[in-house]
Amino acid sequence: LKGYFEIALRDGIKPVKEHLKSNYFGSSFTNDQIKDALKNHDMLDKAQYVDDIDDEVGELLATSDMVVARFSGRLEWGPRALGNRSILANPSDPRIVRKINNAIKMRDFWMPFGPSILSTRIDDYLVDPINSPYMMLAFDTTEKRDDITAALHPYDFTSRPQTVTPEYNSGYEKVLNSFESKTGIGGVLNTSFNIHGYPIVWDPERALDTLNNSSLDALAIGNYLVRK
């Protein structure tokens, strides 16, 4: 920042301070690149091309107990998975925590997951809510907490949510809207797409390796849906 200010002053430019609008700064991959990775893993025959993949993911989460990984767009930069390299599940059933831990995370049972919540629904679930797009703030929860119980701290029912807006991530918001339209629940459980002890996946090869080496039910990767 000091360098920026010095150069701006040197060149007669007024320094500008802007709020961070997004942290999806990582790599993205085309459907053709994803198709090549599916071929390399001999998985193309298991993959279904879905035009409206985000609506399909929301429906899967709403109508089954499936744990679904989502690989879409540019990789998140920072310590949290924010929908583009995420593992998603229905947050209303606390039994899903054990399933996720057994399937991929292998974490201690008491370690909490977090929810992604539509910004239009934060008043329903959070006490004194404000938008928190980076999953960095903690909140007490309201009486409607049972909707998202699997994505809360099991001791005090606090939440460290990601709030989702169409401006921030329109595709991920569509997943949540699809899920909400079928369940009435305004959020999903969201945890990072990786096996415990490994970094978050960043490319199609790592995504498919993780699918094959875990008990995930499905992977939405680009416009392809791969089911176990």
Map each language-model feature to its residues.
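Flexible beta->alpha loop and helix N-cap segments adjacent to enzyme active/binding sites
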Residues: 1-228
